[in-house]
Amino acid sequence: MKRLSTLVDVFLVLALFSCSTWTVWSSSCCNQINLKEIRPHSVSITEFGAVGDGITLNTKAFQNAIFYLNSFADKGGAKLFVPAGQWLTGSFDLISHLTLWLDKDAVILGSTNSDDWPVVDPLPSYGRGRELPGGRHKSLIYGRNLTDVVITGNNGTIDGQGSVWWNKFWNKTLDYTRPHLVELMNSTGVLISNITFLNSPFWTIHPVYCSNVIIRNVTILAPQSSPNTDGIDPDSSDNVCIEDCYISTGDDLISIKSGWDGYGISFGRPSTNINIRRLIGKTTSAGIAIGSEMSGGVSEVHAEDIYVFDSRSAIRIKTSPGRGGYVRNVYISNMILANVDIAIRFTGLYGEHPDDTCDPNALPVIEKITIKDVTGEKVKRAGLIEGIKGDNFVNICLSNITLNVRSKIPWNCSYVKGYSDLVSPEACEPLKERIFPEHISDCYYIPNHLKNLSNQNSGAWLLSW
């Protein structure tokens, strides 16, 4: 298995690394939140009777160790050390001021017995399980209402052994929605780093209703055929930084969400201030996706230095009548694509709904989406951008995009309005009007990228942006 040092070498070869001139919520380059990776108290899971043979079920050992460490929460927190070995377990809950540390060659294995993954209530912003009515199985590693939580180590592994769940999905024998590998809920101050995640039953890392989250230097792997094994899904969360990751899964690498139809509208918590940088991956779905569950709104999404290869699409926005909500102020730049079916895809009729209470008049607002500095080889189609009749997607801005496209019809656009500059092959008719100079204010941009614009000509502006 590739280690993160190898991935860093790949990034350097691609020349994608540079500290950005813009930031959203940190002083520079997604600086770490003030979290304590070093704790004054530490215990090993072996001190609580755990056996790392891959056969013994260690759920009680994890639960007892964390219960004991809770006594140090007001004393600087504590670290639970997981040494080399294969540590089979069912679901267990984290606590505040805890570092879960996996040593090199440590593997936390998810139990293949569904009884070891308890059923919990559905998320209020979804109203039911994502796959089935009713509850959902708790994630393997779970936390709720926490502060200052770290999952890290020396590139240890968390393996969900998801094939048993994928088979249930394919055979239609699920009783409840499948579990995620890691879910943190209503939590703030979260760091996940230097871990390899394998074979999630469902979405891999799911911060929901969270603030101040950093996910960096992680590898996420699942077979391309595995259903719905998204990599990282920030959901109704804010101030999220995802950087220096390699992801190869059976669904979206990153999927930004904020609730489902009327439940998400009523809950009303958006995802905002999402930074994604230095990401490499391949998928049977999208590199960076927004939706389709976006009913609480999604805004201030900034992504750069992205390499997507052997994938269905690079950028995708998914929504539908009945979703409501909005997607606005999205800025994606500096992407390299290789062997991608569709570079840019917006879908206005992604019609999955939780129940028959869906209000078809709850129309989403999709506006101010800027995509720039993109190159691609072996791309089948440049764009399939489909809005909603009577609810156009507006202020879609494309700049400095060069794609080697195989299709004779590179673009297909409907119910969309926007602008473009330096796009090859030439953008579709609704996007042909030039950005500069009249429509700069219609496009979303990072302020530092357009300062002193009034004193520049169009060529200089394009070079400096």
Range-by-range predicted roles:
Residues K2-W465:
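Extracellular/periplasmic carbohydrate-active domains that bind, remodel
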